[in-house]
C-alpha cells in the first residue's frame, strides 16, 4: 500500500522567477508556478496513529508548507520507475533507524502546479521538458500514478544467441541490438571460441566480453602495433609511456598494474582510532602517496550532473581500491567544453555551429557538471583543490584542412591523491576458497554499457543506449564503504582485505573477472546473492549494470566475521556472491531459474583477443599567420580577460569544500582577498607534520591544432612550472599522470597521437627525469550530427592533460602569486627565449584565428634548470611571489598577481622585444617571480648558475595603489585601473553565478570586487595566540574523554578528534550505530562533539534525519537527555552537528530559543574562508576570546539561521545566546554576500545555551586549528591557529 504525504516548498522565489522567465523566453503563456515536495511511502503493513504521526514528523523538514491548496495543472516529477533514487535509499535508512520497519521504501517527487493560458499538447511537452531531466526522471499527471514507482516485476531469464544455428549473422545482430561496439575481428574471435565450446553464447556472456574488451577497458589503441606512412613503428604507445618508468623508476612503488599508482611519501603520524578501544592516536609510519586521474567524458555530455559526479566517485573508488585498501585525500577536476555563449554575455568569437539533439550545451555542462563533481567530493568528504577549465570551438585550418574543432564531446577530468600503508601497497594473494564480496549499494537497472558506449564517437549509438549508459551518484554510500576500507587497513597485518577493485565500467561483469584473474584464480558465483532492489532485472542487467559506489573484494573465509562486524557498524551493505577456485574458469549460477548464465574459461573472456594494428598517415598543419589588423592592446586585454580559459573561476571553486580533513595547506584561493590564482594545491601529509603532497595541472590542447608534439611538451612544461612553487627538492620526486584524449580515426590524428606520445615518453620526460606511472586514454573525441541537410562533425583537438604529483618537504614554504608592495623587483624568466609565438594562444582564439607558429619547450636543459633554480630559491626563502606564464601570457600573469596582492604594477617590457602584442600575449613557458630589491643580485646569480642568464628580464615592480601600467622605453603601452581589470576578469564568473545561483547574491559578490578600499581578511585577537590555557591541566596527566560522535555520512570527525587530542583529551570514536545497538553509552564521557559532514546525505533536512534517529529511539533519547542534564559536561556541534543539535532543543536545557538552520540564501553549497567575530555570550568554549575577529573555514549548503519571527530573534539576542557573527573585512556585522555566506540575520553563525555548556556553530574551527591549514594567515602565527583556543578552553573547563 502507498501513502502520500505533502512536503515543504521545493523552489525558492528566485528559482520560480527563473523558470517563469524561461517559459516566457520560449513564448509559453505560463503565469504562475508553485512547487512542493510530495513523499510516497510504500508500506508492508498499516501504521497505527503514533507511527503515522512519527512518519509525518520525520517528513517535516525545510521551509514551512503553504497553508492554501495549490492551484493549476499538476505535473508530478519523480525518479524514473524501475530506479531507486539516492534520496530514497537514505530516507528509507532513516525511517528504519527510527523504528519504522513497516516502511518498505520512501520516495520523493516534486509536484509542480502550473497556471497558464491555453497551451497545445506540444507546448505542454515543452513545459514538462523544462521541469525534468529525462535521463533520471519521469512526469506523471496525478499523485496516485506514483504507485508505478513501487511496481515489482517477475525476474526474466537469460537469453541465448543462436550462433550454432544462424552462424556469424547472429553475433552481428546481437552486436547492434545490445550496443556492444565489437570489431569485426572480435566477432570472428567469439564465433571461433563458442564453436569450439560447442554451444551458443548467452547475451550476458557477449555483454561481459564487450565490456571487458572495450577500448575503454582494454586500451587497444595504446597497446596496438603502429604503421605510420608505410613504416612499421618499433613501440606501442603504452611502451613509450612505460619508457619513462624504465628510465626513471626512482621513488615509484607501484605503476601500471593497480587502480592507482603509488610513490614514496614521508614518515608521519597517521591519526586514527583503535579498533578495540575506539581511542584516536597518532601512528608514526610512512604515508605513501597514491595518485590517479580519470575522465568521464561521454556520460557528462549526456547528463552533466550525474556524469561528473560519478566521474569523481569512480576516481575516488580507484584510490580506495589501491593495494589492499587506501585512503583518498584530495581531488582535482577539469573541464574542456565548446563555447559557453552565456545569454546576454555572448562573446565576439563565439559562433554557434549547432550540436546533436541528445547531448547538452557547453553552458549546461558548465552549469551542472561542476556542481555534480563538487557535490560528490563534498559529500564524500574530499577537498577539491585544483583544476582547469578550457573552452574551444572554432572553424580552423588545421592538419586536415578547414574543419570544426571543439569540445561538443567534453572532457571531464577527475583525479586526486591519497595515502596508503607501506605493507598494503601490493595486493595480497587470493587463496582458493576465499570469499568474493561486493561491498556497497544494490544492483540497479542503470549505467548499462558505459564502457562500450564511451568507446564510440558521440552520435554513433542509439539515443536510448546513450541514456542507459549514464549512472547515478550516491556519495554518502561511498563514504560508508570507504569507512569500512579505512577500518580494514587500520588493522595493519590483520587487514581482512586480500584483494580489492572498484566497480566501474561494465559493472560486476568486468570487476569480478578482473579480481579473480589478477589474483591468479577462477570464480564461481551465485547471481541471486547479488544485492538488488529490482527483482525484475534480467541476469544481464544484474551482472552488467554500472550501479555506483561498489567495490569487489576477496576476503579470507576465516576473516569474514570481522569484516561483517565492520560493515554492520558502518551500515555499509555487502554480499558474499562467490568464492575463488583453483580452475581458471568463470561460472555464474542462477538459482531462481536453476541454470548457468555464464560458464566460460577465463581465457575466452580475457585471453589473447585480436591485437589491433593502426595503419595511418601523417598530416602537417599549414596554419595562417596571425592577422593583426584591428587588434589593439586595450581591446585584446578585455577580450582575453573574458575568455573562460583565462577568466576568474570563482563559480567553480566556492561550490567545492576546500578545508575538510584539516590537512589543506594551499587551496585555490590566495591571500586576504581570496583570489583563485594558486599555482598548485598542497596538503599536509598528516595532522602532526609539515611534510605534504602537491598537485598541479598542465594542459595546452589548442596548440595540437598546429603541432601535436609541441602541445604535449607544453602540457608537461606547464605542469612543471605550476608545481615548482612549493618545496619538493629533486625533480625525480615529481610523478605525472597523462590523460590522452583524441578522435582516433580522424585524418592525421592517429599519427599525431603517436608523435605526441613519443615526444613525451621517449624524449622530454626521460631527459627531465620525470616518470608517468599512471594515466588514461579516451579515443572517441568526436561528435557527429545532422544540421538541416548537412552532415556535421565537431572534433576535439588532441588533448593531453598532465597532472603532476609530488611529495613536499615543507608545506609552509609554498609560494603564491600574492604580491607584496615592499621594496621589490619583478623578474620574468622567459623559457621561450624571445620566440614570443602567438599561434594557438588565447589572443588568437578571441580574434577567431589559429595562427601558425605555437609556443614549445625551446630548451629541455633550461626547463630542468628553471625547476632546479626555483627550488633553490624556495629553499633559500628568496621568493616573495611566484606565478607561471600560461593562458593569456605575461599580461594575465601580472594581472593575476596584482589581483592577489590588491596592488598596482609598474611594468616595463622594454627588454622583451619591439613586438609589444607578442611580448604581452605569447604563452611560452616561464614565470614571473617577485623578490626583494636587495635580493635581486643574489637571485639572478642563482638563475645564472642554472643556465638561465639569457632568460631573465626585469619587468618592473609592484606598487601600492590601483594603477596597472605597462611601459617600454618610457612610452606607455597600456594603462588601466587594477580594479577595472579585476571586474573584467570576474564578469564570466559573475554571469555564470547569476544564471545558476541566486542572482542577488551574485550581484553582491561582483559589487564587492570593485571596492578598491576593501582591506581584505584581517585579524584582531583579544587573547595571546601562543598561550596554552590547557597546559596546567594537561600536566596533571588526566585526559578526560570526549565522544567524537558521527553518523553515516559525517566526514569531519578525524580532524575534530585531533584538535581535542592536542588540547589534552582522549578522543573516542563513537558511531551512532554504537549507541543504537548499546555497544557504547555516553555515561563515561565528559564531553561530546557532533561533527560535520552530510549525515544521510542531508536527506530530510541537514542534520534532521540524524536528530530524529535520536528523538524517535527511546533508549538513545534518554541517553542524550541524561548527558545534557548532567553537570560538568560540555558539548559542541559543528556544521552538520550544529544542524543536528539545533533539532534536539527539547533535550538540551537552555536551548529553547535556538533557531533552525536552513538553505543558504544563495541556494548553493558555500565553501568560504570567512571573517567572524566572537561576541559576548555564556559559551564556555569561547571564554577569553570575546571581541576577537578572525577567519574560519565555512562549508555548508544549509547554514542560514531561521527564526519564527522578529520577537524570536530579539529574545535570542537579548538573552545573549549569540556566540559568533559574520563580519565584513571592515569589521562590521554583515548580512551581505559573500562576507555572510548564508544570509543569516544579524550575521549569526553560532549560538549557545544559557549555561554556556553547549555551543553549536556552522563554521569549522577543527579544520583550521593548525596555522598551516588556514587559507591565509598573518606571517607571525606559529604552529597553532587562534581556533585552537576553543579546544583548550574545553580542557580548562573540565579541570
Curated annotation (Swiss-Prot):
Mg(2+) binds at residues 718, 722, 884. Its EC number is 6.3.5.3. It catalyses: N(2)-formyl-N(1)-(5-phospho-beta-D-ribosyl)glycinamide + L-glutamine + ATP + H2O = 2-formamido-N(1)-(5-O-phospho-beta-D-ribosyl)acetamidine + L-glutamate + ADP + phosphate + H(+). It is found in: Cytoplasm. Coiled coil: none annotated. Monomer. PANTHER family: PHOSPHORIBOSYLFORMYLGLYCINAMIDINE SYNTHASE. This is Phosphoribosylformylglycinamidine synthase.
Amino acid at each position: 500500500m502507498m501513502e502520500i504525504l505533502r512536503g515543504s516548498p521545493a523552489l525558492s522565489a528566485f528559482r520560480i522567477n527563473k523558470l517563469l522567465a524561461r517559459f516566457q523566453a520560449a513564448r509559453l503563456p505560463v503565469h504562475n508556478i508553485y512547487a512542493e515536495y510530495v513523499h510516497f511511502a510504500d508500506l508492508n503493513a498499516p501504521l497505527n496513529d503514533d507511527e503515522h504521526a512519527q512518519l509525518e514528523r520525520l517528513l517535516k523538514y525545510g521551509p514551512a508548507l503553504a497553508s492554501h491548496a495549490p492551484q493549476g495543472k499538476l505535473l508530478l516529477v519523480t525518479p524514473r520507475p524501475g530506479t531507486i533514487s539516492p534520496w530514497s535509499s537514505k530516507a528509507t535508512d532513516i525511517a528504519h533507524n527510527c523504528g519504522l520497519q513497516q516502511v518498505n521504501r520512501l520516495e520523493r517527487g516534486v509536484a509542480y502546479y502550473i497556471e497558464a493560458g491555453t497551451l497545445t499538447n506540444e507546448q505542454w511537452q515543452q513545459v514538462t521538458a523544462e521541469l525534468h531531466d529525462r535521463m533520471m526522471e519521469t512526469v506523471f499527471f496525478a499523485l496516485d500514478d506514483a504507485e508505478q514507482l513501487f511496481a515489482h516485476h517477475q525476474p526474466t531469464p537469460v537469453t541465448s544467441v543462436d550462433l550454432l544455428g544462424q552462424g556469424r549473422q547472429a553475433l552481428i545482430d546481437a552486436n547492434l541490438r545490445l550496443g556492444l561496439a565489437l570489431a569485426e575481428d572480435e566477432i570472428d574471435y567469439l564465433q571461433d571460441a563458442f564453436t569450439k565450446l560447442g554451444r551458443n553464447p548467452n547475451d550476458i556472456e557477449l555483454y561481459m566480453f564487450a565490456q571487458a574488451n572495450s577500448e575503454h577497458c582494454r586500451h587497444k589503441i595504446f597497446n596496438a602495433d603502429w604503421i605510420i606512412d608505410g613504416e612499421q613503428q618499433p613501440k606501442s604507445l603504452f611502451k613509450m609511456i612505460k619508457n619513462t618508468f624504465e628510465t626513471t623508476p626512482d621513488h615509484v612503488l607501484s605503476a601500471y598494474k593497480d587502480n592507482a599508482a603509488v610513490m614514496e611519501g614521508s614518515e608521519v603520524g597517521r591519526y586514527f582510532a583503535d579498533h578495540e578501544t575506539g581511542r584516536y592516536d597518532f601512528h608514526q609510519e610512512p604515508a605513501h602517496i597514491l595518485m590517479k586521474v580519470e575522465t568521464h567524458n561521454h556520460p557528462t555530455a549526456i547528463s552533466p550532473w550525474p556524469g561528473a559526479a560519478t566521474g569523481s566517485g569512480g576516481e575516488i573508488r580507484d584510490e580506495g581500491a589501491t593495494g589492499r585498501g587506501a585512503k583518498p585525500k584530495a581531488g582535482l577536476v577539469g573541464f574542456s567544453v565548446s563555447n559557453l555563449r552565456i545569454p546576454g554575455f555572448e562573446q565576439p568569437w563565439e559562433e554557434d555551429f549547432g550540436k546533436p539533439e541528445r547531448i547538452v550545451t557547453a553552458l549546461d555542462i558548465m552549469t551542472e557538471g561542476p556542481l555534480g563533481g563538487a557535490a560528490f567530493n563534498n559529500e564524500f568528504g574530499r577537498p577539491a583543490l585544483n583544476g582547469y577549465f578550457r573552452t574551444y570551438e572554432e572553424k580552423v585550418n588545421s592538419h586536415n584542412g578547414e574543419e570544426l574543432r571543439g569540445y561538443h564531446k567534453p572532457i571531464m577530468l577527475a583525479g586526486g591523491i591519497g595515502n596508503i600503508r607501506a605493507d598494503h601497497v601490493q595486493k595480497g594473494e587470493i587463496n582458493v576458497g576465499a570469499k568474493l564480496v561486493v561491498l556497497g549499494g544494490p544492483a540497479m537497472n542503470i549505467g548499462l554499457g558505459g564502457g562500450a558506449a564511451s568507446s564510440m564517437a558521440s552520435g554513433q549509438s542509439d539515443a536510448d543506449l546513450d541514456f542507459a549508459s549514464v549512472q547515478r551518484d550516491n556519495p554518502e554510500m561511498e563514504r560508508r564503504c570507504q569507512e569500512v576500507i579505512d577500518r580494514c587497513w587500520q588493522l595493519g597485518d590483520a587487514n581482512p582485505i586480500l584483494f580489492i577493485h572498484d566497480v566501474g565500467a561494465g559493472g560486476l561483469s568486468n570487476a569480478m573477472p578482473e579480481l579473480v584473474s589478477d589474483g591468479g584464480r577462477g570464480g564461481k558465483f551465485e547471481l541471486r546473492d547479488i544485492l538488488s532492489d529490482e527483482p525484475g532485472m534480467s541476469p544481464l542487467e544484474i551482472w552488467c549494470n554500472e550501479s555506483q559506489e561498489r567495490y569487489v573484494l576477496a576476503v579470507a573465509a576465516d576473516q569474514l566475521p570481522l569484516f561483517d562486524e565492520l560493515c554492520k557498524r558502518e551500515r555499509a551493505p555487502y554480499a558474499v556472491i562467490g568464492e575463488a577456485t583453483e580452475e581458471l574458469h568463470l561460472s555464474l549460477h542462477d538459482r531462481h531459474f536453476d541454470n548457468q548464465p555464464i560458464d566460460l574459461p577465463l581465457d575466452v573472456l580475457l585471453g589473447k583477443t585480436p591485437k589491433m594494428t593502426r595503419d595511418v598517415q601523417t598530416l602537417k598543419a599549414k596554419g595562417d599567420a596571425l592577422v593583426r589588423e584591428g587588434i589593439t592592446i586595450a581591446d585584446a586585454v578585455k577580450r582575453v580577460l573574458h575568455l573562460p580559459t583565462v577568466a576568474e573561476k570563482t563559480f567553480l571553486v566556492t561550490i567545492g569544500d576546500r578545508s575538510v580533513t584539516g590537512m589543506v595547506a594551499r587551496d585555490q584561493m590566495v591571500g586576504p582577498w581570496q583570489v583563485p590564482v594558486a599555482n598548485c594545491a598542497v596538503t599536509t601529509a598528516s595532522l602532526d607534520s609539515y611534510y605534504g603532497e602537491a598537485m598541479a595541472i598542465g594542459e595546452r590542447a589548442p596548440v595540437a591544432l598546429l603541432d601535436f608534439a609541441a602541445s604535449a611538451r607544453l602540457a608537461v612544461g606547464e605542469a612543471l612550472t605550476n608545481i615548482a612553487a612549493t618545496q619538493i627538492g629533486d625533480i625525480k620526486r615529481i610523478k605525472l599522470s597523462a590523460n590522452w584524449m583524441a578522435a582516433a580515426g580522424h585524418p592525421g590524428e592517429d599519427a599525431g597521437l603517436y608523435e605526441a606520445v613519443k615526444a613525451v615518453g621517449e624524449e622530454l620526460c626521460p631527459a627531465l627525469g620525470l616518470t608517468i606511472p599512471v594515466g588514461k586514454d579516451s579515443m572517441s573525441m568526436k561528435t557527429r550530427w545532422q544540421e538541416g541537410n548537412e552532415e556535421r562533425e565537431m572534433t576535439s583537438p588532441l588533448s593531453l592533460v598532465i597532472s603532476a604529483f609530488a611529495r613536499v618537504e615543507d608545506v609552509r614554504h609554498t609560494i603564491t602569486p600574492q604580491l607584496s608592495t615592499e621594496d621589490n623587483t619583478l623578474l620574468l624568466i622567459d623559457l621561450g627565449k624571445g620566440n614570443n609565438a602567438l599561434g594557438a594562444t588565447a589572443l588568437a582564439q578571441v580574434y577567431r584565428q589559429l595562427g601558425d607558429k605555437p609556443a614549445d619547450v625551446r630548451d629541455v636543459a633550461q626547463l630542468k634548470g628553471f625547476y632546479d633554480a626555483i627550488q633553490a630559491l624556495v629553499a633559500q626563502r628568496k621568493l616573495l611571489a611566484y606565478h607561471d606564464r600560461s593562458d593569456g601570457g605575461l599580461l594575465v600573469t601580472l594581472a593575476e598577481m596584482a589581483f592577489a596582492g590588491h596592488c598596482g604594477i609598474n611594468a616595463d617590457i622594454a627588454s622583451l622585444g619591439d613586438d609589444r602584442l607578442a611580448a604581452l600575449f605569447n604563452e611560452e613557458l616561464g614565470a614571473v617571480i617577485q623578490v626583494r630589491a636587495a635580493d635581486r643580485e643574489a637571485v639572478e646569480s642563482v638563475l645564472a648558475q642554472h643556465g638561465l642568464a639569457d632568460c631573465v628580464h626585469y619587468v618592473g615592480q609592484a606598487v601600492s595603489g590601483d594603477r596597472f601600467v605597462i611601459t617600454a622605453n618610457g612610452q606607455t603601452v597600456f594603462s588601466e585601473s587594477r580594479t577595472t581589470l579585476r571586474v573584467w576578469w570576474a564578469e564570466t564568473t559573475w554571469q555564470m553565478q547569476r544564471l545558476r545561483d541566486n542572482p542577488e547574491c551574485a550581484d553582491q559578490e561582483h559589487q564587492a570586487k570593485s571596492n578598491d578600499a576593501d582591506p581584505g581578511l584581517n585579524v584582531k585577537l583579544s587573547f595571546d595566540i601562543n598561550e596554552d590555557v590547557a597546559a596546567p591541566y594537561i600536566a596533571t596527566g588526566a585526559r578526560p574523554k570526549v565522544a567524537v560522535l558521527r553518523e553515516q555520512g559525517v566526514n569531519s570527525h578525524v580532524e575534530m578528534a585531533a584538535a581535542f587530542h592536542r588540547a589534552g583529551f582522549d578522543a573516542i570514536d563513537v558511531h551512532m550505530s554504537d549507541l543504537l545497538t548499546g555497544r557504547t553509552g555516553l555515561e563515561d564521557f565528559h564531553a561530546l562533539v557532533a561533527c560535520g559532514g552530510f549525515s544521510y546525505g542531508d536527506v530530510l533536512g541537514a542534520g534532521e534525519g540524524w536528530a530524529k534517529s535520536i528523538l524517535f529511539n527511546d533508549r538513545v533519547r534518554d541517553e542524550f537527555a541524561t548527558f545534557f542534564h548532567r553537570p560538568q559536561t560540555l558539548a559542541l556541534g559543528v556544521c552538520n552537528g550544529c544542524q543536528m543539535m539545533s533539532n534536539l532543543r527539547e533535550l538540551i536545557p537552555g536551548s529553547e530559543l535556538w533557531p533552525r538552520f536552513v538553505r543558504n540564501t544563495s541556494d548553493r553549497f558555500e565553501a568560504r574562508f570567512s571573517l567572524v567575530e566572537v561576541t559576548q555570550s555564556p559559551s564556555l568554549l569561547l571564554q577569553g576570546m570575546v571581541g576577537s575577529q578572525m577567519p574560519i573555514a565555512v562549508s555548508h549548503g544549509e547554514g542560514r539561521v531561521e527564526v519564527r519571527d522578529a520577537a524570536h530573534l530579539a529574545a535570542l539576542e537579548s538573552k545573549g545566546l549569540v556566540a559568533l557573527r559574520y563580519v565584513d573585512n571592515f569589521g562590521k556585522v554583515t548580512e551581505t554576500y559573500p562576507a555572510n555566506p548564508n544570509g543569516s540575520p544579524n550575521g549569526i553563525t553560532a549560538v549557545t545555551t544559557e549555561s554556556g555548556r553547549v555551543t553549536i556553530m556552522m563554521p569549522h574551527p577543527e579544520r583550521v586549528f593548525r596555522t598551516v591549514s588556514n587559507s591565509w594567515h598573518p606571517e607571525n602565527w606559529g604552529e597553532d591557529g587562534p581556533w585552537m583556543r576553543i579546544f583548550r578552553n574545553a580542557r580548562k573547563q573540565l579541570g
